[in-house]
């Protein structure tokens, strides 16, 4: 039996397309109930850049934080395109993270995030089509070199883009992606690891001279 606060499944009509529209945060859905499952149409997907995946989605033990998207290779000035048709919700700059970035809102609670632009090519509330240029690649914000940080979010939850898209082929793995809340929670939860410093001091050995036994 489902818990009261959880819906069994949602459709496009269940998500308010204007929810949190004026919220400046990337995740503006913190007050929304997350359904157990949802079917998301991703058939329109277009590669934002023709680059390879240089860093995947997941927990980074070295930095002790989640990487909530993937990084795609590009050169500064390369055109970055909208992955799906939608409306521009955020055009902003974040020095300690995304740098120059854009958030696009799509159907049914889906949003995409594009980070580290050298230049924005769209304005807030602009309607864009899949494949339309939205920015130029760069290395602004927390970045060690030119690349595109790309996220696919559902109701604010950062999904694994590589579970939805085959980035080698540049096409969605399935036209309809099924979101599963329990699977997401298990996948996105970092493994509990012990980061306390281990005692690396070598054990003291007994180097005392042994008595020679007379023959």
Listing of model-derived features with the role each one plays in the protein:
Residues 55, 74, 90, 116-119, ...:
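A residue-level detector for short acidic-glycine micro-motifs
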Residues 65-68, 82-121:
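Zn2+-dependent peptidoglycan hydrolase active-site motif and core
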Residues 100-106, 126-183, 187:
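Conserved, short, structured surface segments that act as functional micro-motifs
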Residues 38-46, 61-93:
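Short, glycine/small-residue-enriched coil/turn segments at secondary-structure junctions
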Residues 1-57, 172-215:
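Polar/charged, compositionally biased leader and regulatory segments
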Residues 74, 83, 122-123, 128:
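Surface-exposed strand-loop junctions at beta-sheet edges and helix termini
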Residues 12, 31, 39-40, 48-50, ...:
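Extracytoplasmic
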Residues 58, 75-77, 85, 93, ...:
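Solvent-exposed coil/turn segments that connect beta secondary-structure elements
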């Amino acid at each position: 039996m489902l818990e009261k606060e959880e819906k069994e499944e949602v459709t496009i009509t269940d998500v308010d397309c204007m929810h949190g529209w004026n919220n400046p945060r990337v995740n503006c859905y913190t007050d929304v109930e997350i359904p157990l499952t949802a079917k998301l149409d991703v058939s329109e997907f277009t590669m934002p850049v023709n680059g390879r995946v240089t860093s995947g989605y997941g927990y980074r033990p070295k930095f002790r934080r989640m990487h909530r998207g993937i990084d795609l290779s590009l050169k500064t000035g390369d055109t970055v395109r909208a992955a799906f048709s939608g409306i521009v919700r955020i055009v902003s700059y974040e020095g300690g993270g995304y740098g120059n970035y854009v958030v696009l809102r799509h159907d049914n609670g889906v949003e995409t995030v594009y980070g580290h632009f050298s230049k924005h090519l769209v304005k807030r509330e602009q309607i864009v089509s899949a494949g339309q240029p939205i920015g130029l690649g760069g290395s602004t914000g927390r970045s060690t070199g030119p690349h595109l940080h790309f996220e696919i979010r559902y109701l604010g939850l950062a999904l694994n883009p590589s579970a939805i898209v085959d980035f080698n082929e540049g096409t969605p793995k399935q036209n309809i992606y099924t979101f599963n809340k329990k699977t997401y929670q298990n996948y996105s939860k970092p493994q509990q690891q012990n980061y306390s410093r281990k005692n690396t001091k070598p054990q003291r050995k007994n180097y005392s001279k042994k008595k020679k036994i007379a023959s």
